[in-house]
Design a protein with these regions (language model features):
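Catalytic cores and adjacent binding grooves of peptidoglycan-active enzymes
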Residues: 13, 56-126
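Extended, low-complexity, intrinsically disordered C-terminal regulatory tails
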Residues: 25-52, 98, 104-106
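A broadly tuned "polar low-complexity/structure-edge" signature
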Residues: 17-20, 33-37, 89, 115-118
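Charged, low-complexity, helix-prone segments enriched in Lys/Glu/Asp/Gln
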Residues: 12-15, 43-50, 85
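Short glycine-/small-residue-rich flexible loop motifs, especially phosphate/cofactor-binding loops
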Residues: 23-24, 46, 89, 93
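Active-site acidic/histidine clusters and adjacent loop/turn architecture
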Residues: 1-33
Length: 126
């Protein structure tokens, strides 16, 4: 079983409490260790990410604390292997379902698939 590290906990500061609960439960369920790469994001940081092509919107859910990016943590570093993100997503979805929280995974998007990205569903968290 894995647990969130100090840095991950710090990066969850400012994130909506329901999403924090999902992440905290998912780390218990996940067969893959993960780290929180980013939670709450400033509008300036978002502009930088859009300019670099790392994001496609200035209206990111990160700006309101309604999104997190998680990185698969393997051999003390982030591993970007896509299959790992499916496993993390399964844990996040199971945790969300268990807690009655509706989330959206960036890996399920039709365009600009974003494996590390999880956000609270706008239908329930406008």
């Amino acid at each position: 079983m894995f647990k969130l590290g100090k840095r991950s906990i710090e990066r969850l500061q400012g994130v909506h409490p329901d999403l924090v609960k999902v992440v905290e439960r998912a780390i218990d369920l996940s067969p893959v260790d993960f780290t929180v790469l980013e939670g709450l994001r400033s509008p300036e940081r978002q502009q930088t990410l859009v300019a670099s092509g790392a994001s496609q919107t200035l209206n990111s859910r990160h700006i309101t604390g309604h999104a997190v990016d998680l990185g698969a943590w393997v051999d003390n570093q982030v591993d970007w292997s896509w299959p790992l993100y499916h496993k993390i997503a399964n844990a996040m979805k199971a945790a969300a379902n268990e807690l009655g929280v509706s989330i959206v995974w960036g890996g399920d998007w039709r365009t600009f698939k974003d494996g590390p990205h999880f956000e609270l569903d706008r239908k329930f968290y406008p």
